[in-house]
């Protein structure tokens, strides 16, 4: 459920995996640049991607997702949350100059319009989205796993993350 799965057959599996990673990177870059820019900024902006479903059609990929964008500041060995929020919806990704780029992001609305917009956007994937979105355990596990990967890839000397008013969580 939390992995973007693209069709792969025979020896195309490796290229499918690298394409999946490239799509995830495009999604993360979009969230940091286009969404993260609207939050109070810290030192690091880290998106958490929870993929509900993905479909490919030629050079276009559609990804239904439940994403979080969080800004952190580094305090010793801890990432302390500065700001952030949830951004659920449908991302459209197209190949441009040989790499995937997010070209559209239709998001759910806040408040009273949330449920109708989520049902419309997620359509046949709504039940999966609803279970994922409603589960704090799923969100916490995805966030922890993806933060751990982020810290490792960048060689940061960080062992914990901490939301304001909560205990630090070990990565």
Q: What residues fall within each predicted segment?
A:
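General "foldedness" signal
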Residues: 41, 45, 77-79, 114-119, ...
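Mature extracytoplasmic domains of secretory-pathway proteins
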Residues: 47-112
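Soluble non-cytosolic domains of exported or imported proteins
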Residues: 21, 80-83, 137
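C-terminal motif of bacterial Sec signal peptides marking the signal peptidase cleavage site
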Residues: 5-8
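N-terminal export/targeting and maturation segments
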Residues: 11-69
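Sec-dependent N-terminal signal peptides
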Residues: 1-2
């Amino acid at each position: 459920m939390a992995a973007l799965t693209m069709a792969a057959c025979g020896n195309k599996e490796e290229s499918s995996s690298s394409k999946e990673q490239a799509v995830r990177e495009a999604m993360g870059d979009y969230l940091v640049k286009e969404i993260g820019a609207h939050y109070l900024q810290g030192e690091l902006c880290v998106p958490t991607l929870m993929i509900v479903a993905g479909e490919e059609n030629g050079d276009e990929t559609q990804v239904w997702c439940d994403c979080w964008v969080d800004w952190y500041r580094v305090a010793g060995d801890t990432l302390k949350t500065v700001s952030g929020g949830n951004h659920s919806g449908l991302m459209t990704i197209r190949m441009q100059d040989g790499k995937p780029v997010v070209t559209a992001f239709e998001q759910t609305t806040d408040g009273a319009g949330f449920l109708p917009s989520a049902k419309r956007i997620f359509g046949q994937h709504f039940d999966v989205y609803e279970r994922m979105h409603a589960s704090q355990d799923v969100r916490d596990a995805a966030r922890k796993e993806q933060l751990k990967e982020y810290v490792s890839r960048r060689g940061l000397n960080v062992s914990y993350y901490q939301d304001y008013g909560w205990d630090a969580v070990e990565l």
